[in-house]
A protein has these predicted regions:
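Short solvent-exposed loop/turn micro-motifs enriched in small/polar/acidic residues
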Residues: 83, 163-165
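Intrinsically disordered, low-complexity terminal regulatory regions
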Residues: 4-104, 227-231
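Residue-level recognition of the N-termini of beta-strands and the immediately preceding loop/turn
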Residues: 84-88, 113, 181
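A short, aliphatic-rich beta-strand micro-motif
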Residues: 165-174
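Regulatory sensory and allosteric helical modules in signal-transduction proteins
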Residues: 92-162
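Juxtadomain coupling helices with adjacent low-complexity linkers
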Residues: 179-231
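Short, flexible loop/turn elements at secondary-structure junctions
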Residues: 92-94, 106, 174-176, 187-189
């Protein structure tokens, strides 16, 4: 009994340490990125190609930083059998056709999400997805998918559910509560994202959504000046 309690205690400590590190990572990178945002705004000049690249990089860096934090805490620090694989995406409305697209992403292979290939020929690819449903939710309620096995979860290509087992779709809102997109995290572990852990994921994801919201607003300002970003 003592041994069992000790094992449980160690497991609880490891879980709490992991949650703390995951939470801390978001605010650490947010503070670091603020100076980059300030620099971009100060140098704002519609049509500047370097600014265009900078705004896109801000989106991708937010996804990469979140992915790296999750991979470190739930991948590198655990055994191979306990390793959880993640994919992070920023979904938003395209500046070209106003349909939902994936503007930035991060995953183990560094490849664009497979569904984007179909998006080129079918702008309505993401209609009916969790992000699409969140766009129609005035309350901007985060969506937790404990298991993608349910028939209500839209599969974007054959076999997607065999790779994506659980997801969280978090609203990216601006200072006026306007929806600028969603921060989506998928993983290959059933039951990883649940409504019961909403507070943990709110604290974890919000710093990254703030970075994405500001980057999206900057992208819109560029578009108003006649400069289109590639999404």
């Amino acid at each position: 009994i003592v041994a069992a309690l000790d094992t449980a205690s160690r497991a609880d400590r490891a879980r709490l340490e992991r949650e703390y590190a995951t939470h801390r990572g978001g605010y650490h990178t947010l503070n670091r990125e603020i100076s980059r945002y300030i620099g971009l705004v100060r140098e704002f000049s519609p049509g500047d190609p370097e600014l265009v690249k900078g705004v896109l990089e801000l989106m991708f860096s937010a996804c990469r930083d979140l992915y790296d934090t999750l991979e470190t805490e739930y991948g590198l620090k655990v055994s191979v059998s306990d390793h959880i694989e993640f994919e992070v995406t920023f979904m938003t409305r395209s500046l070209s056709d106003d349909h939902i697209t994936i503007a930035a992403w991060a995953n183990r292979d560094g490849r664009a999400p497979k569904s984007l290939a179909g998006r080129k020929d079918n702008p309505a690819t993401y209609v009916g997805t969790e992000t699409d449903q969140l766009y129609h939710d005035d309350n901007r309620t985060p969506r937790f998918i404990g298991s993608t096995d349910g028939t209500a979860y839209k599969e974007l290509y054959p076999g997607q559910k065999t790779r994506i087992k659980s997801s969280v779709i978090w609203p990216v809102v601006d200072d006026e509560f306007g929806l600028r997109g969603t921060l989506v995290v998928h993983c290959d572990r059933v039951g990883f994202f649940t409504l019961d852990s909403e507070k943990l994921w709110r604290e974890t994801l919000e710093p990254y959504t703030k970075r994405l919201a500001l980057a999206r607003v900057l992208a819109e300002k560029l578009a108003e000046g006649g400069t289109r970003l590639d999404f």
